[in-house]
Amino acid sequence: MVCRTCHCTITECCRSTRRDPSPTEPVVRLSRRKYGEHMKTACVIGAGAAGLAAGKALADRDIDFDWFEKGSYVGGLWQIDNDNGGAAAYHSLHLNSSRPRTQYPSYPMPEDWADYPPYYQVAQYFEDFADHFGLRERITFNTAVEKVEPVGDHWEVTTSDGQTREYSNVLVANGHHSSPKIPHFAGEFTGESFHAHDYRDLSVFAGKRVLVIGVGNSGMDIACDAARNAEAVYLSTRHGVHVIPKYALGKPVDQLSSPLMAYVPFPVERLAYEAIVRVATGRPQDRGLPKPDHKLLGAHPTVSAELYDRVGHGDVVMKPDIERFEGDKVEFVDGTTEAVDIVVYATGYNVSLPFLEGVYTPEHNKMPLYLRVVPPDLPGLYFMGFIQTVGSGIPLTEYQAEWVGDLITGEVPMPSRDEMRRWIDADQKAMAKRYVRSERHTMQVDYWRYIKTMKEARGKGGLLSKIPGLR
């Protein structure tokens, strides 16, 4: 038996008190523990990347909690055709962040995996994580949370089985990629259309004329997929973007960064990235894409190892924004017109929290949260994983979860409301100066700086105190 935490081959892991259960050995539930004079109870909503991190953090502290997952699986959007309705994986999907930058700090991915594993290995990684830490039997599957509301000094949570339960703390980890955003255009398109959320396989494009709207990661992936068997592929964008390669200088590009970036002034960091990307790929406007109207890292970059070649080969034709649809014709703002059979909207998502209606409703995807987790005026409510970063958010969710676990047990204090509001105000001003104004950039955090911030919030002495792990 090999432990993923340290790869030792003994039954009892030398770096962890946990071990893999045998197929016939049930995992023993952790005992309940009282903190102070009453039981501290919690509820976790969702069993995707952020939910799994949250559940592990609570279980590690012997906190008594319930855990609800709408579907039948752990892993959230990485489970293709997940029956919770939140799946966004497709058959060609691979990680856009490298394996070491994507894994949870407490549970490394196997070293013999590829630099950028496919979706099904990532899904298996979450399954293995849940089993390794004895989390699966804690989850109530196929049970949706329908309502969460504050009542006095606690929270009432109503689930799809008709029960209402009380908790001191609610950890919301349902993700922010479940409610597709589809823009409105003048006219009417009479062909087939769907959101990238519903895309699974390139067979749908065979022999068709395809228009993909949006140049985020999914948009570029889908356009490149379509180029393999479609009659024609057009990729429409309102503005230029910086395209980040997966490799530069012989390494996965995100491995060229280091924890030291948390201590480097942002302009210096930007110059370093610009030099690397320009050497690796050149400028977007020199590779057939529109010139970006912002500097590198001034917006969420798009990662693609294939698009530039597809454009250079003529397999994907870049187009500007759409003016209007008319039947099977699409007119672009530059006056050109193309006939298409399929339109794919790779146009992002709206944050959806229907169970918090009337309690907490994000406007234009804005969520003013202390450390991107805590709403100052709603004590006991935590939002896990509602972040975006240049890199993977998965490891960041574990840093969030460990901090929240410390808050619940009282190991670290919760700042005052005024302190939290001041932090939020400063953070929002900093992000407004750095990023273009759009609904996509309301959750941005800097990968290394955010880890440093979360470790300091736990009193762990900053990022460089112990980079690989959490404790």
PLM regions and their residue ranges:
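Basic, ligand-binding patches in group-transfer machinery
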Residues: 258
